[in-house]
A protein has these predicted regions:
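N-terminal hydrophobic or amphipathic helices and topogenic motifs
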Residues: 2-72, 113, 287-329
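Bilobed "Venus flytrap"/periplasmic-binding protein-like clamshell domains
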Residues: 39-65, 69-70, 124-192, 308, ...
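An extracytoplasmic/periplasmic, membrane-proximal ligand-sensing/linker region
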Residues: 185, 192-193, 202-220, 230-237, ...
Length: 329
């Protein structure tokens, strides 16, 4: 009995040791696998706006689709800071609003930025929102009034400058412009009556939703049809954009305005193979990304091709993947 009991205890001890070894071995393997994931930094913008929400959705989607990658979003001051951070190699990827990308890639008002396009994000229709109980119904009604034009480093402020210029207005002289530290600070100014309107863009933009869902509701103000044509004639790089009815609470009619496409840009030295893997993950998980964030349904390979100012601005690694899809020659 003593010998049998000793053997039994020895067998149990051996089994327990084996289980522990297996457990810790698997833990080490998992830890090692996590450590081996390639980290990719992604610059977004200030908290409270659309870029951080979009960046988080993109990062989670890519990381889930390609476990060898670890895309890590980082709050920044927005498009105006993201471009120089990419140029300095301090970010791998960054979200850049359309007008900021246009100026940077074409060297308007600054040296030309030597960067690549990874993907088109979504179209940003430029609009004002006011409280539904306010007397303001046109852009002219807002002249001389305090208007929130977004965070100081946001590309949306640049979009406002181009749109208003096309109407013969000056953003900084014809209005009382308010620029913010954080995009999320804008809605309270309108809701509390300290600002007449909030300028912004894109369907699902959190500050627009905050005003539209406020106690008084919201009303959008856009250029009229003649104004849209004036803007497009003055600044042809802008595009006509329609916001479908029902895109926001209380919005019962389509809104026809102008805007531009925002982009995910990359540093110039991002390896071709890495850009290829990122583009592939985005394409393969397009439906997953759309479910995470409905506005990201526009993050599609076809839109990248259509929205890029020139095809040679698309990263060579992305171009290789698009050729494999049969979308580029």
């Amino acid at each position: 009995m003593g010998i049998t009991g000793s053997k039994a205890r020895w067998s149990c001890l051996t089994l327990a040791t084996a289980i522990l070894a297996l457990f810790f071995g698997e833990t080490d393997m998992l830890t090692g696998a996590a450590a081996d994931r390639m980290k990719v930094s992604l610059g977004t913008a200030t908290p409270g706006g659309g870029f951080p929400v979009y960046g988080q959705a993109v990062a989670e989607t890519i990381n889930q689709t390609d476990p060898s990658l670890s895309v890590e979003p980082r709050n920044t001051r927005g498009s105006a800071e993201n471009v120089p951070l990419l140029e300095a190699g301090q970010l791998d990827l960054a979200l850049v609003q359309g007008e900021s990308a246009y100026e940077a890639l074409n060297g308007i008002g600054r040296p030309r930025a030597d960067l690549w396009i990874l993907a088109a994000m979504y179209a940003s229709p430029g609009m004002f929102i006011v409280r539904a109980d306010s007397p303001y119904r046109s852009i002219d009604d807002l002249k001389g009034k305090p208007v929130v034009f977004g965070a100081a480093g946001s590309g949306l402020g640049i979009l406002a400058r181009y749109v208003l210029d096309g109407l013969g207005l000056d953003r900084d002289r014809d209005f009382q412009p308010i620029f913010l530290e954080h995009a999320g600070d804008g809605p309270p100014l309108v809701l509390e009556g300290r600002a007449a309107a909030l300028w912004g863009g894109s369907v699902g933009w959190p500050p627009f939703l905050a005003v539209a869902q406020g106690p008084a509701g919201g009303r959008f103000i856009i250029p009229d049809a003649a104004g849209v044509q004036r803007i497009l004639s003055t600044h042809p790089f802008l595009k006509p954009i329609t916001v479908q009815a029902g895109s926001f609470p209380g919005q019962v009619v389509p809104l026809h305005t102008v805007g531009s496409w925002s982009f995910i840009l990359t540093r110039r030295t991002l390896p071709d193979n890495l850009a290829y893997r990122l583009a592939k993950a985005l394409h393969q998980a397009q439906e997953v990304l759309s479910r995470r964030l409905p506005q990201a349904r526009e993050t599609a390979a076809a839109n990248t091709i259509g929205a890029a100012p020139r095809l040679d601005l698309i990263h060579p690694g992305v171009q290789r993947y698009l050729r494999e899809l049969g979308m580029l020659r």
